[in-house]
A protein has these predicted regions:
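ABC-type ATPase nucleotide-binding domains, specifically the catalytic core motifs of the NBD
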Residues: 16-20, 58-63, 80-81, 86, ...
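ABC ATPase NBD coupling module
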Residues: 23, 60, 78-95, 113, ...
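P-loop NTP-binding/switch modules centered on Walker-like glycine-rich loops
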Residues: 58, 179, 183, 187-270
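Conserved ABC transporter NBD signature motif
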Residues: 65-77
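Conserved ABC ATPase "signature" region
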Residues: 76-77, 129-148, 257-258
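A short, proline-enriched helix->beta-strand linker immediately N-terminal to the Walker B motif
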Residues: 172-176
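Charged, flexible cofactor/metal-binding loops and thiol motifs
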Residues: 240-335
Length: 335
């Protein structure tokens, strides 16, 4: 583990018993996050992105089980510490911005109470000190007249303001790792851009490692340092944002990128790209590449277990075919 590594995840597995068997929503995924770095985990709904974040936070549903070879924050295993110690970490070194700002804040408590509680709980701060910190951070996240907002309740704020409050709350104790689970989903496009810029600026200022979970490749292009592409509970490709966008190595990543309209290039009314087929079930025994039934490059060998190909530091993809997409097309042509 490098000195610059903040979070190290190796072979993380999440299993959930369901009436038809065992659901495997997260299957042996590995990644790391460095200090001051943004890792975007991208994939469609149901691929296991949010459960990955909940597994790191220790907030999985009671029925779910979590296992991993390594799950370390600043060298300390999150698998071996008791729940009370994990509760001390959450909101302190480890913070999360949840998906829907409309329902993430408690409607019964004022903004000031909810912000202050974090610092008082983890730092033993006085109410006055917590109030000062809350005002400072509300101003930092772009909320005007911050002191007057402390007495307001969530229903008195717009969605964009509520999400800014959630970001301020996550920053109250100067966390080392911030997990943002689709933080712009419920917001309009203009506010989305503001929130992304805000997360980026506070990350650089406080040297926070960020895991940004999203299904929006536009968000990824805007803020990611590195990208992990998830499909059916597995990470199928990792690399820097530039590497993944300019030279995708997994057919699923290529399919996602082909779905994006390009201003000035995509003609009005032109049919957009799509990925045929449906996502397979993750219940029961799974083998081979789960994307094979939807893949243009599928081979008989895809039904066998597919390992990770490592091209260099931080550049991997899970496919039996060569990295050069042109070579794949030649293979398909001769079939």
């Amino acid at each position: 583990q490098k000195l610059s590594t903040l979070l190290e995840v190796e072979d993380l597995v999440v299993d959930i018993p369901v009436p038809s068997g065992i659901l495997h929503p997260v299957r042996e995924i590995s990644f790391h996050v460095d200090y001051g770095e943004t890792l975007c985990i991208v994939g469609e709904s149901g691929c296991g992105k949010s459960l990955t974040s909940l597994a790191i936070m220790g907030l999985l549903p009671n029925a779910a089980s979590r296992n991993a070879k390594q799950l370390n924050l600043e060298g300390e295993s999150l698998l071996e510490i008791p729940e009370s110690a994990l509760a001390d970490l959450r909101g302190d070194k480890l913070s999360m911005i949840f998906q829907d700002p409309m329902t993430s804040l408690n409607p019964s408590y004022s903004i000031g109470n909810q912000l202050g509680e974090v610092l008082m709980r983890h730092r033993g701060a006085t109410r006055a000190a917590a109030r000062d910190r809350a005002v400072y951070l509300l101003e930092k996240v772009g909320i005007s007249s911050a002191a007057s907002r402390l007495g307001q309740y969530p229903h008195q704020l717009s969605g964009g303001l509520r999400q800014r409050v959630m970001i301020a709350m996550a920053l109250m104790c100067e966390p080392r790792l911030l997990i943002a689970d689709e933080p712009t989903t419920a917001l309009d496009v203009t506010i989305q851009a503001q929130i992304l810029l805000l997360i980026r600026s506070v990350q650089k200022e406080f040297n926070i490692g960020v895991i940004l979970i999203t299904h929006d490749l536009g968000v990824v292009a805007r803020v990611a340092d590195r990208v992990a592409v998830m499909y059916s509970g597995q990470i199928v490709e990792t690399g820097t944002a530039i590497e993944v966008f300019e030279k995708p190595l997994h057919p699923y990543t290529q399919g996602l990128i082909d779905c994006i309209p390009i201003p000035g290039k995509t003609k009005p009314g032109e049919q957009l790209g799509s990925i045929p087929g449906i996502v397979p079930t993750l219940v029961g025994d799974l083998s081979g590449c789960t994307f094979r039934d939807r893949c243009d490059f599928a081979q008989n060998e895809c039904a066998d277990d597919v390992g990770e190909n490592v091209l260099g530091a931080g550049r991997q993809f899970r496919c039996i075919l060569p990295a050069e997409l042109g070579s794949r097309k030649e293979l398909v042509a001769v079939q």
